[in-house]
Amino acid sequence: MSASDLTSVQAAAPQGDRQILVTSALPYANGQIHIGHLVEYIQTDIWVRTLRMHGHEVYYIGADDTHGTPIMLRAEKEGLTPKQLIDRVWTEHKRDFDSFGVSFDNFYSTDSDENRVLSEKIYVALQDAGFIAEREIEQAYDPVKEMFLPDRFIKGECPKCHAKDQYGDNCEVCGSTYLPTELLNPYSVVSGATPVRKTSKHYFFRLSDPRCETFLREWVSGLAQPEATNKMREWLGDAGEAKLADWDISRDAPYFGFEIPGAPGKYFYVWLDAPVGYYASFKNLCDRNGVDFDAWVRPGSTTEQYHFIGKDILYFHTLFWPAMLEFSGHRTPTNVFAHGFLTVDGAKMSKSRGTFITAQSYIDTGLNPEWLRYYFAAKLNATMEDIDLNLDDFQARVNSDLVGKYVNIASRAAGFLIKRFDGRVQDSAMNHPLVAKLREAIPQIAAHYEAREYGRALRHTMELADEVNAYVDGAKPWDLAKDPANAVALHETCSVSLESFRLLSLALKPVMPRVAEAVESFFGIAPLAWSDAAKPLSSEQPIKAYQHLMTRVDPKQIEALLAANRDSLQAEATGAAVATANAAKDAKNSAKANANAKQAVVNGADDAPISIDDFAKIDLRIAKIVACQAVEGSDKLLQLTLDVGEEKTRNVFSGIKSAYQPEQLVGKLTVMVANLAPRKMKFGLSEGMVLAASATDEKAEPGLYILEPHSGAKPGMRVK
């Protein structure tokens, strides 16, 4: 290898001069880690390892999210204190993260002294700056447990479709959303008692303050993901719309959390102290390691701060969190990276089908965690797209890529090198064109990882692995070994193969760190960094005896995994069913004592009169058309993206293409049926219906006209 070749490869690698703080969302200390959670932690860990391999100063911080009513109630149910519960769950979560190679520099807890102090400090700073408001609000109250009830702890009869045992904020049968006060025959999930209405003073973060809007409009321009930027702009609205609402940051006792300074019996809502937990975990690490915490978090700091999250919590991390930091005297995040959800075999994870797979069950079944790391990485990119774990594809891809292509290279060459050449490579082979091609590809692969385009990085790597295998197939070392006269050619072939394998291992190291560690031991080399692309194997360092690096996925392992999750969750499901049945029975008894349930039954012809109860079943909402496009392959349909006042938009296909161009509709308000059952169409899932008017005889009087409300109507408003 020439000096100029070495110089060019070294120059392509970024110098390790950045200081970077990275977090993943905090898992709630109320349950097990499952493979859906692992998507995020594996994604973050790959990125962190990529940066470390450049030599940057990187801290990967995590913690359990430990506060809130669910923690308090679960602890009570199990006969534990909340502290005992969260300590046990912390141990389980830490075990699972370690099993999957998630390399936190510190994994802590939000129930810590550091978090209490920082949460209070941020709150007081916001209060002093005029961002805290006090208001009396009315809430549901459990008279038996003497506690205010979150929406999800109230059940009753859906006011729209009259389905029983529905939550206090939405119906799982018809999809309607509503206020807890609209629920019919409500009961407390905690005690079964009928809730009463009670007022209480609450504390709000004034997100509606014009200073917040001005700051957030500027901050959002720096987000890396267009989907996140667009979502933020939807939430912010146009200048002057004042769409941001104040955020209730307090909860009443009894509550497991931190008491608000100067407000006895009032506690910080979990979503205030949870993100502060990022800083608390980091401060705990800094104090132990002599790192200047303040230098990392003060305004104007030259350090970088990144948050990896699921797209379902984008709202908290791109509105509340940066605004809290900005106006409490802290630096704001450099960027927030959101990912999509995980499906298994094309469907939502299911306990009944065994696809609600826990991290521990995966390990207990004997599956290699680096198989899952590789599979997720092959599916992940820089967008918020959902990814699917197809179990057949998982087995095929691991067996083909990792065993058939990658590991196979070392196993085909190592034996010959040890037996014939004392395990020492041929130095001249390090200049082979194939080796040079792999070496030159390393900076691009590293760049793909840093851009969070893991799928691209792995596709490039496996394309190179194909070329190496083609080289070995063409050289046929097994035939060369038969004739001593071919010793030089055999030595070169084995040396090229193993140096190529080293470079492929370097390319795969962020994804498969344990395999990379085994490869480093096999070659007798220091831990691989990106700059080591320019440091080939040497005859001065003999390789060790080859140890098998990876086995194939056995279909029986997948079957055992699904069975294990069905079996382990059966008792839980049975217990939950009994509890639900008892609660429902209590609710029915309470309902009979307090009210007569109404059930609407529609009979008769289409033009028969209907009752007001029948009409009330239809959930009509104001919707804003935030995007519109023609549907390829259809001459009738337009695809609408609708803001209906929820945290996420709705996708609706509408047969109005004959009347409107897509650009005519963007920005308009219309009326939609929000509780229509989603319909799977050829072009995708339609999540509702927009309303349009037309003549009875459309041939004689053609035309379609979407309904538009008067000015002043806002997305999410109900049409009554």
From Swiss-Prot:
GO terms for biological process: methionyl-tRNA aminoacylation. One of its GO terms (cellular component) is cytosol. Gene3D superfamilies: HUPs (3.40.50.620), Isoleucyl-tRNA Synthetase, Domain 1 (1.10.730.10), Methionyl-tRNA synthetase, Zn-domain (2.20.28.20), Nucleic acid-binding proteins (2.40.50.140). A motif ('HIGH' region) lies at residues 27-37. Keywords: Aminoacyl-tRNA synthetase, ATP-binding, Cytoplasm, Ligase, Metal-binding, Nucleotide-binding, Protein biosynthesis, RNA-binding, tRNA-binding, Zinc. Binds 1 zinc ion per subunit. Is required not only for elongation of protein synthesis but also for the initiation of all mRNA translation through initiator tRNA(fMet) aminoacylation. This is Methionine--tRNA ligase. It comes from Burkholderia lata (strain ATCC 17760 / DSM 23089 / LMG 22485 / NCIMB 9086 / R18194 / 383).
